[in-house]
Amino acid sequence: MQTIDRLDMLRTSVAALRQGGGTVALVPTMGALHEGHLTLVREAAGRADHVVASIFVNPTQFGPNEDLDAYPRQLAEDCAMLEAEGVALVWAPTVEQMYPEGFASSISVSGVSEGLCGADRPGHFDGVATVVCKLFHQVLPDMAFFGEKDWQQLAVIRVMARDLDLTRPHVAAIRGVATVREEDGLAMSSRNRYLSPEHRQAAAILPRAMKEAIGAIENGAAVAPTLASLEAALLQAGFDSVDYATLADAANLQPLERLAMRPARLLVAARIGGTRLIDNMAVGKV
């Protein structure tokens, strides 16, 4: 497995992988890998001849009061895990490589990026869209894999790829992979390591409360009071605050007051012990 931090070397190495018609899948990450990331790698390996994983802690998607400096960085450990999974190449650029002096461009995806996490983290999805677009242009993958845990991020990336007429990857080849969960149902996240044992135990109420709310909505309960009950359950369990608990259209993320004959998601962001957790689940049978 190669680990590369120069763009010219990346392009040469990817071209070599493509010799003979081999397909290339990209799995973008910020490192601090866990089983959720490795599941993305395995899905990619099952669909492409070669897997390229990127590791880059992207400063432009962190706000001024967020955890950029504290975000875990463990390149050697991450690379060992990726090599064990058969990854062909790790693209680990420096900040200077991605954003050289004079860098002045940004991609903003309106609409789908503006509510939910976008409302609480202004500029976050501009940073996500910009860095992912750069990664797509750098690697030119045939397909790319993202976790469904960050559902809004996945939606933003798909709209960006559609609107910019990207062909590598085409929007249809941007694949979402089901959220990987701990034994108690909590969605795997690099930020879970910030939780104290007490807060980690309390956090397990999040997926349980979401499933209860989904069951109620699917059985005809009114959406607004059901979501209010969900928020109350989280606060009672020890969460500090709930940023949002929303039923939304799965594609455009517009809030829904009732289930319709199209895919929907329940999306929640809540804070416990200073750590912000997000989760989402499908709602309805469509």
From Swiss-Prot:
Provide the GO biological process annotations: pantothenate biosynthetic process
| Keyword Metal-binding assigned | no
Is-annotated flag, keyword Cell membrane? no
Quote the record's binding site residues for ATP.
Answer: 30-37, 147-150, 180, 188-191
Q: Which of UniProt's keywords are assigned here?
A: ATP-binding, Cytoplasm, Ligase, Nucleotide-binding, Pantothenate biosynthesis
Q: What is its main location?
A: cytoplasm
Q: Which residues hold beta-alanine?
A: Q61
Instruction: Provide the E.C. number(s) assigned to this enzyme.
Output: 6.3.2.1
- Pfam families to which the protein is assigned, alphabetical: Pantoate_ligase
Listed GO CC annotations:
cytosol
- Active site per UniProt: H37
Q: List positions binding (R)-pantoate.
A: Q61, Q153
Its pathway? Cofactor biosynthesis; (R)-pantothenate biosynthesis; (R)-pantothenate from (R)-pantoate and beta-alanine: step 1/1
Q: Where in the cell is it found?
A: Cytoplasm
- A molecular function GO annotation: ATP binding
Q: What else is known?
A: The reaction proceeds by a bi uni uni bi ping pong mechanism.
What this chain does, per the entry, is described as:
Catalyzes the condensation of pantoate with beta-alanine in an ATP-dependent reaction via a pantoyl-adenylate intermediate.
NCBIfam families listed in its UniProt record: cyt_tran_rel, panC
Q: Which family does it belong to?
A: Belongs to the pantothenate synthetase family.
Subunit relationships: Homodimer.
Protein known as: Pantothenate synthetase
Which organism's genome codes for this protein? Answer: Erythrobacter litoralis (strain HTCC2594)
Point out the gene that encodes the protein.
Answer: panC
